[in-house]
Curated annotation (Swiss-Prot):
It comes from the Eukaryota. The keyword Acetylation applies. The modification Phosphoserine is found at residues 119, 200, 390. WD repeats lie at residues 201-240, 243-282, 285-324, 327-366, 369-409, 410-448, 459-498. This is Pleiotropic regulator 1. Identified in the spliceosome C complex. Component of the PRP19-CDC5L splicing complex composed of a core complex comprising a homotetramer of PRPF19, CDC5L, PLRG1 and BCAS2, and at least three less stably associated proteins CTNNBL1, CWC15 and HSPA8. Interacts (via its WD40 repeat domain) directly with CDC5L (via its C-terminal); the interaction is required for mRNA splicing but not for spliceosome assembly. Component of the minor spliceosome, which splices U12-type introns. Within this complex, interacts with CRIPT. Also interacts directly in the complex with BCAS2 and PRPF19.
Length: 513
């Protein structure tokens, strides 16, 4: 006789399963998970390689730091050393803070760790203990700066004032003279910019834009695979050039010859003769999409950057690849050239900026301050400085070694393009269609613009891919995702009274990396 199996509801079966599972693991409840040493070592090795791989080779300190300091002489900090008696240690007069910045790149040797950072009371007692003449002489001795040990990309550090001792009866009442708090300069007033023309004609995203040196016309490249030349004064289409088989990502007009250069996602770099409107040269070598290009201002050299993680230097006339600039670990998004050293600057999706030696074809400096992809770099036309843009952040740097100047925060979007004019107006354009205008010197954001998309486009097609000032710097052109080119000009009716600078100085502006 077959025994019938008792049937239970699904609810009861689930709870019984939960109880069996609980009884099985109740003994291990609350205990820490045992650490696997081998997997932990591998994880740390991978993390070190991924995050610190590009900066493994740090600058070394000078050899003279390893030499023994003679007696009756000043040490490498500029501090006076006194001869030691038998059984007595050498005492140091500390007149300032430690000259070596606490950053990477300074080797900790017997000389660099010999002194400790003095407290205010300790420095004051040392100054009181010495004769007035000796203390004054030592206090006035200049402390050598630690700039030569500064890691590339680190900000300049100002040395605080040293101990100053009064003469005569006030010798015992010496004190450390506090340095005056730094004052922030007031931003220069700039008139706001307003939209006055929208030019349509492309059938796809407008990805790049350039103005010709004569300021008569400008050229755009688009995702519709065409290059269009427009009259700058009227905004009318003059010419369309076809030849690329994919999105055109970069265009530039030569100042030395009647040539137009273009690059695209079809891996091609083309040279167009504008007298015949035909392609006369191809530059072959990139293995993937070419994202940008720039011409050297003084020699016939073209530089391109690509998704294949390299930038290439081309001889314009012979079409030969002079150098392949390798070192980036991800797509190179932007490249800029200048006549002074360093002559080539690249920004990449690997979050780094590299300054290159054009002659040797090697990296001079690698800047690792950005935390996200660097999609835009712009050089100031007058100052020896440049700016770089990544999502949510713009940074300013100083040539030739890439010293960090300041952050420009507030444009919370993916920044695709940067441009600056000689008056110090920096423009940043982002993928959400917003455009911010900044004062270059102070980093003050004086205007924010978000133009409406053209009728028939989606709001999500609001994005700025490229922007440029014309040669007179009176007009600003933007290439956008709604298939249009927008032209802005300064508001002639604006004054400092109608559009005042809404600026409040901070007591101390933090320099963040």
């Amino acid at each position: 006789m077959v025994e019938e199996v008792q049937k239970h509801s699904v609810h009861t079966l689930v709870f019984r399963s939960l109880k069996r599972t609980h009884d099985m693991f109740v003994a291990d409840n609350g205990k820490p998970v045992p650490l696997d040493e081998e997997s932990h070592k591998r994880k740390m090795a991978i993390k070190l390689r991924n995050e610190y791989g590009p900066v493994l080779h740090m600058p070394t300190s000078k050899e003279n730091l390893k030499e023994k300091v003679p007696q009756n002489a000043s040490d490498s900090y500029g501090h006076k050393q006194y001869p030691a008696n038998q059984g007595q240690e050498v005492e140091y007069l500390v007149t300032g803070t430690h000259p070596y910045p606490p950053g990477p790149g300074v080797a900790l040797t017997a000389d660099t760790k010999i002194q400790r950072m003095p407290s205010e009371s300790a420095a004051q007692s040392l100054a009181v203990a010495l004769p007035a003449s000796q203390a004054r002489a030592d206090a006035n001795r200049p402390v050598p700066a630690g700039g030569e040990y500064r890691h590339p990309g680190a900000p300049d550090r100002a040395q605080p004032a040293g101990a100053v001792v009064m003469e005569g009866s006030n010798a015992k009442n010496s004190a450390l003279m506090a340095k005056k708090a730094p004052t922030m300069p007031k931003p220069q007033w700039h008139p706001p910019w307003k939209l006055y023309r929208v030019i349509s004609g492309h059938l796809g995203w407008v990805r790049c834009i350039a103005v010709e040196p004569g300021n008569q016309w400008f050229v755009t490249g688009s995702a519709d695979r065409t290059i269009k030349i427009w009259d700058l004064a009227s905004g009318k289409l003059k010419l369309s050039l076809t030849g690329h088989i994919s999105t055109v990502r970069g265009v530039i007009v030569s100042t030395r010859s009647p040539y137009l250069f273009s690059c695209g996602e079809d891996k091609q770099v083309k040279c167009w003769d504008l007298e015949y409107n035909k392609v006369i040269r191809h530059y072959h070598g990139h293995l993937s999409a070419v994202y940008g290009l720039d011409l050297h201002p003084t020699i016939d050299v073209l530089v391109t950057c690509s998704r294949d993680s390299t930038a290439r230097i081309w001889d314009v006339r012979t079409k030969a690849s002079v150098h392949t600039l390798s070192g980036h670990t991800n797509a190179v998004a932007t490249v800029r050239c200048q006549a002074a050293e360093p002559q080539i600057i690249t920004g990449s999706h690997d979050t780094t900026i590299r300054l290159w030696d054009l002659v040797a074809g090697k990296t001079r400096v690698t800047l690792t301050n950005h935390k996200k992809s660097v999609r835009a770099v712009v050089l100031h036309p007058r100052h020896y400085t440049f700016a770089s843009g990544s999502p949510d952040n713009i940074k300013q740097w100083k040539f030739p070694d890439g010293s960090f100047i300041q952050n420009l925060s507030g444009h919370n979007a993916i920044i695709n393009t940067l441009t600056v004019n000689s008056d110090g107006v920096l423009v940043s354009g982002a993928d959400n269609g917003t455009m911010h205008l900044w004062d270059w010197r102070t980093g003050y954001n004086f205007q924010r613009v978000h133009a409406a998309v053209q009728p028939g486009s989606l709001d999500s097609e609001s994005g700025i891919f490229a922007c440029a000032f014309d040669q007179s710097e009176s007009r600003l052109l933007t290439a956008e995702a709604d298939k249009t080119i927008k032209v802005y000009k300064e508001d002639d009716t604006a004054t400092e009274e109608t559009h005042p600078v809404s600026w409040k100085p901070e007591i101390i502006k933090r320099k963040r990396f």
